A protein has these predicted regions:
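N-terminal targeting/export leaders
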Residues: 1-130
Length: 130
């Protein structure tokens, strides 16, 4: 009687690292205005104003997700200074995961009254994996 035992060693699974994404919104001269990062769950954007400065009197900067199709989705008014967090709705998460594109417009104080950009689009950027 002959018995054989075969041992198979499998490598330990490598834990999947969370994907990190970020963007830099720059002025024409290359100075960063805001730094953006996406949490590993994709449901929160963290923004830090670097050299943005305040919008002109009676105006605010507004952040938008630019989907691959359809109209932009507002993520709210951007602070001219400080760090700010923006919670993303399911719709915004879905749009951002597809297009990875954000835009900033100049809007009336308090943001767009229509839910769509009404002022000039000042900056467009993409989120990139870090």
């Amino acid at each position: 009687v002959f018995f054989a035992v075969l041992l198979v060693l499998q490598p330990s699974p490598v834990p999947e690292r969370p994907m990190l994404a970020g963007a830099i919104i720059e002025a024409e001269l290359g100075d960063p205005l805001w730094l953006l990062s996406e949490t590993d769950r994709g449901n929160l954007l963290k923004l830090r104003a670097v050299a943005a400065g305040s919008a002109e009197s009676g105006k605010d900067y507004e952040l938008w997700v630019v989907p691959e199709e359809g109209r932009p989705l507002s993520l709210g008014v951007l602070p001219a200074s400080e760090t700010h967090q923006v919670g993303l709705s399911d719709e915004a998460q879905s749009s951002l995961s597809g297009s990875r594109t954000l835009a900033i417009s100049l809007e009336p104080e308090g943001g767009s009254p229509t839910g769509a950009p009404t002022g000039p689009i000042l900056h467009v950027t993409r989120l990139y994996e870090l």
